[in-house]
Each structure stands twice: as C-alpha cells, then as structure tokens.
C-alpha cells in the first residue's frame, strides 16, 4: 500500500506568453520605410496613406515620413506623410 495519498493534479499553473501587440510608433514620430507602426489582431486600426498591411494585420510604413493617426468614416486610420525639408 502507498504510504502517502497521491497528489491531485493541479488545474491551474499555466499562462500564455504575451504577444507584444499595440502601437509601436506614435503620432508625430518620424519613421523610415518598413518600420512597424501597429501590431494588432484584426483591423482595430486601418492603413491610410503610405501605410501597408501584412497578413497578420500588422501596419507598416511604405515611405519615410511622419506618423499621423486620424479618423475617417468613424474608423481609426494611421497614415505616413513625407516630411518637408
């Protein structure tokens, strides 16, 4: 016979790693082409002028310029405008 009752298996004790989602470059920041602006699940924020969208809904700059967050038709949109020198 067992001298000790077997320990019950725990139901908790696990946690998923964070995915580091969110805005990576903010309004007014200067960015280079290819810089990631937003990492997101689904289109919380839509791509505007000079912004591309990856298959995982990541928004990235297509040109060098300044980031601008706007609303268009009730949707949040992020655009990149060239900086005048």
From Swiss-Prot:
Residue span of region Disordered: 1-20
Skewed-composition ranges (Polar residues): 1-11
GO molecular function: structural constituent of ribosome
A Pfam family annotated for this UniProt entry: Ribosomal_L27
Gene3D superfamilies referenced in this protein's UniProt entry, alphabetically: 2.40.50.100
Annotated PROSITE patterns: RIBOSOMAL_L27
A single Gene Ontology CC term: cytosolic large ribosomal subunit
Keywords noted in UniProt: Ribonucleoprotein, Ribosomal protein
Single Gene Ontology BP annotation: translation
Family note: Belongs to the bacterial ribosomal protein bL27 family.
Protein name, entry field: Large ribosomal subunit protein bL27
Species in which this protein is naturally found: Sulfurihydrogenibium sp. (strain YO3AOP1)
């Amino acid at each position: 016979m067992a001298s000790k009752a077997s320990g019950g298996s725990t139901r908790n004790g696990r946690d998923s790693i964070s995915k580091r989602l969110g805005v990576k470059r903010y309004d007014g920041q200067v960015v280079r082409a290819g810089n990631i602006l937003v990492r997101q699940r689904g289109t919380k924020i839509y791509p505007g002028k000079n912004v591309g969208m990856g298959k995982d809904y990541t928004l990235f700059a297509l040109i060098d310029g300044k980031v601008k967050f706007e609303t268009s038709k009730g949707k949040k949109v992020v655009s990149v405008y060239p900086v005048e020198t």
